[in-house]
A protein has these predicted regions:
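Nucleic-acid substrate recognition interfaces
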Residues: 1-430
């Protein structure tokens, strides 16, 4: 009885996720596909082209600003991205809506001037517009901001490591070691020593805690202090941790990444792309909400669009609107503990149906806390005492072996393999 009560209490617990999604094909849920599929595909392709031009324009605009404004870049936010989208599309067909603020008008004028002078001469002429796509553009702005933030959070440390390797000529030093030392054992020892030395330099560069001393050789300390002014933002770091601060305010690190890659480029080495671009010819997913459906799919004989978009009618009739265009009675539109959020993501072929937790329907969502994950990689730990008595297992996923495990680095290590056909093998390494 006691265990049953515990089980019932766990069953009542709210899911940790605010949203969930279910993926299916667009044709399986869309009504009147002979008419509506083409309309949705047109918007998907148009949005894909807008994103391509927006990302390219942003790269050119930010680099130009960096080079002409003393290594200062413009504030990259949704307002800038949205206005870039509008500039690359040209004039809007309809003039409905309130006038932009004075600051926005000045920004648009500046972006338009840059577009005509610098961007347009280097691109193929392409007719784009964003008629009835205001909400779609807003969602795309969020996606582009996420692209920039993810790129910085995931790769900033890699850029620092690349920068150190290039400045201190790691590639050339390794080649010299391989030529000078005759035996393999000596070569490997010298390379390990070099890598250990460079690792200490990288750690010192990434250390923002003033109470922690440098660990590298004193010969490098002056250089490290000088380079920190270029490759770290001039600010107070959250919790004295660069990894935590990267999660909180990643955009502060973009000028630093540009500076590092400029130095790598000057040394005629291969650079990494600081700016996210879209090179795929396959369109990406776009989000469609209720009001976008009305503007895109509602025909004249079915009613006036403004009747569904004024006086709160969009919210009042959202179930009716979605039922009119989609087969919402299907099981795929239901999920236990969640309610259909009246929003989908689609690339014209596949579709992801978005669900929101039932207790959050119609409410303001709790703010998600930004910060580093509680889980750390083993090389990020400061205290290894708890691992001393544990058996360490190395796991490597792959294609031929879904999982490959070893318990030692020697030839006598035990190996556990799980292959695609489902057979498990446990053998000592030969």
């Amino acid at each position: 009885m006691f265990s049953k009560c515990i089980w019932m209490e766990k069953a009542k617990e709210k899911p940790s996720e605010f949203f969930k999604s279910t993926k299916t094909s667009l044709k399986s849920i869309l009504k009147h596909p002979e008419i509506n599929t083409r309309k949705i595909n047109d918007v998907v392709i148009k949005a894909h082209k807008i994103v391509i031009h927006t990302l390219q324009f942003l790269k050119m605009y930010i680099l130009h600003h960096y080079q002409t404004q003393s290594q200062i870049i413009p504030i990259i936010d949704k307002i800038l991205i949205l206005n870039v989208m509008k500039v690359v599309c040209g004039e809007k067909h309809t003039n409905q809506g309130r006038l932009p603020k004075k600051e926005t008008l000045e920004l648009i004028e500046n972006l338009t001037s840059f577009y005509i002078e610098h961007y347009k001469p280097h691109t193929q002429p392409e007719q784009l517009d964003y008629e009835y796509m205001s909400n779609v553009l807003s969602y795309l702005c969020e996606d582009i901001m996420t692209m920039y933030e993810n790129n910085i959070q995931l790769h900033y440390v890699d850029y620092v490591e690349r920068f150190v390797n290039v400045v201190w000529k790691k590639k050339m030093m390794v080649e010299k070691i391989r030529k000078i030392f005759p035996t393999k054992k000596e070569r490997e020892a010298r390379v390990r020593q070099l890598e250990k030395e460079l690792r200490k330099i990288k750690n010192d560069l990434l250390n923002v805690d003033s109470n922690v001393d440098y660990t590298s050789h004193p010969h490098y300390h002056k250089w490290i202090t000088q380079q920190k002014k270029c490759i770290l933002p001039n600010k107070k770091f959250q919790k004295q941790s660069i990894y935590y601060d990267l999660k909180c305010k990643p955009m502060d690190y973009l000028p630093c990444m540009i500076a590092m890659m400029k130095q790598v480029e000057n040394d005629e080495e291969t650079i990494s792309n600081v700016f996210p671009l879209r090179s795929s010819i396959s369109p990406g997913y776009i989000r469609l909400d209720t009001i976008t459906l009305v503007y895109l799919l509602l025909r004249k004989e079915q009613g006036k669009k403004r009747d569904y978009c004024n006086q709160g009618n969009t919210k009042k009739h959202e179930d009716k609107i979605w039922k009119f265009f989609f087969r919402t009675e299907k099981k795929v539109f239901r999920k236990n503990g969640f309610s259909f959020h009246h929003m989908i993501s689609t690339d014209g072929v596949g579709v992801s149906i978005l669900f929101i937790r039932e207790d959050l329907v119609g409410k303001r969502l709790p703010s998600a806390k930004k910060g580093v994950s509680k889980e750390l990689y083993i090389d990020e730990l400061n205290d290894y005492s708890k691992l001393q008595d544990k058996k360490v297992i190395g796991i490597d996923p792959g294609k031929s072996d879904l999982i490959y495990c070893v318990d030692d680095a020697s030839k006598n290590a035990n190996v556990f393999r799980y292959q695609p056909h489902g057979t498990q093998t446990k053998t000592p390494r030969a």
